[in-house]
Amino acid sequence: MKPSILEKLQQLGDRLEEVTHLLGQPEATSDMDNYRKLTREHAELTPVVEVFQNYRLAQSDLADAEEMLSDPEMKDFAAEEIEAAKAKIDELDTELQKLLLPKDADDDKNIFIEIRAGTGGGEAALFAGDLLRMYSRYAERNRWQVEIVSANESELGGYKEVIARIVGLGAYSRLKFESGGHRVQRVPATESQGRIHTSACTVAVMPEADELEDIELNPADLRTDTFRASGAGGQHINKTDSAVRITHLPTGMVVECQDGRSQHANKAQAMKVLAARLNDAQKREVQAKEAAERKSLIGSGDRSERIRTYNYPQGRVTDHRINLTLHKLDFVMDGDLAEITDALIAEHQAELLAAMGD
């Protein structure tokens, strides 16, 4: 392990002692904001320091085993102990480097997920509906909540565009690599000749802004239009101009919300989506630069990139960024995404570790 990393770990250990001392003071709870901040820092530092303690213990075991080598009667035993200690040190070294990777401040946040039908017309809209169900089922598996924010339904079923909000700790960390082009190959229900068609959808995953203050929205930059909501919602929703369209004039971004029961609710939700989109645009600009520097295919924020193909006749899913192919399409479409998301996170961590070593 590099001396600079060892020094950093020692500093973290010292800081944990300091934070523990501060939390133990009688006046610690007099400033609740600072108390919460210290508690959060304590929770973040503890696992790193514990692994570092185990690392130093393994190093001590290695030194003890090497001393035993000089004893002829203990030589074989010592050799086994040395091998075990070295393996443990390597394992803990890797774990420590992962723990020291820079944290994405958005990882624990709720998300907005936008799914837009692309090439393929009605079939693409149906696939957008399938993707929404896939992410909704994945959310259920994680005990997250799903709310439909805005939906532009297709005449044949599915969606031309749908925006959902997923509420749950770590939602962004698990789904942030889903942004990009998703392609489906299958025989449409309307196809009488049994020919396979290719359709596509674009997915955008955006962390929800903590507060609207995170993004400075100048009222002069916004144009708000109201109109009558269409689609489901009963009699009341179509009698008033409850739907809201907000246009961000500097960027041309347009957000529509009409699924709420009032104009006020729709405007509030539209502002949240707009804030998330503006935050996301800034984040993707930074990600693209960082990804280009390390020649990364994951986390580049490039929405035009085709990231995954769902082939129904062959029952397979292929993620093109990491050359991962799974022959369990039905399970994936039912929300069994863990194998894919785990592999993407692992690859992203490996890229960051490689960058740390450069």
From Swiss-Prot:
Q: Which residues carry this modification: N5-methylglutamine?
A: Q235
Q: How is it modified after translation?
A: Methylated by PrmC. Methylation increases the termination efficiency of RF1.
**Main localization of the protein described in the UniProt heading:** cytoplasm
Q: Which GO terms describe its cellular component?
A: cytoplasm
User: Is this entry keyworded Cytoplasm?
Assistant: yes
Which molecular-function annotation in GO is an example for this chain?
A: translation release factor activity, codon specific
Q: Which UniProt keywords apply?
A: Cytoplasm, Methylation, Protein biosynthesis
Keyword Iron-sulfur on entry: no
Q: InterPro entries recorded for this chain?
A: PCRF, Pep_chain_release_fac_I, Pep_chain_release_fac_I_sf, Prokaryotic/Mito_RF, RF-1
Question: What SMART domains does this protein's entry cite?
Answer: PCRF
Q: Which cysteines are joined by disulfide bonds?
A: none
Localization recorded for this chain is:
Cytoplasm
Spell out the family assignment given in the record's similarity comment. Belongs to the prokaryotic/mitochondrial release factor family.
Fetch the NCBIfam families from UniProt: prfA (TIGR00019), PRK00591.1 (NF001859)
Q: What does this protein do?
A: Peptide chain release factor 1 directs the termination of translation in response to the peptide chain termination codons UAG and UAA.
- The entry's protein name is Peptide chain release factor 1
Which species is listed as the source?
Neisseria gonorrhoeae (strain NCCP11945)
Q: What is the lineage of its organism?
A: Bacteria, Pseudomonadati, Pseudomonadota, Betaproteobacteria, Neisseriales
Name the gene: prfA
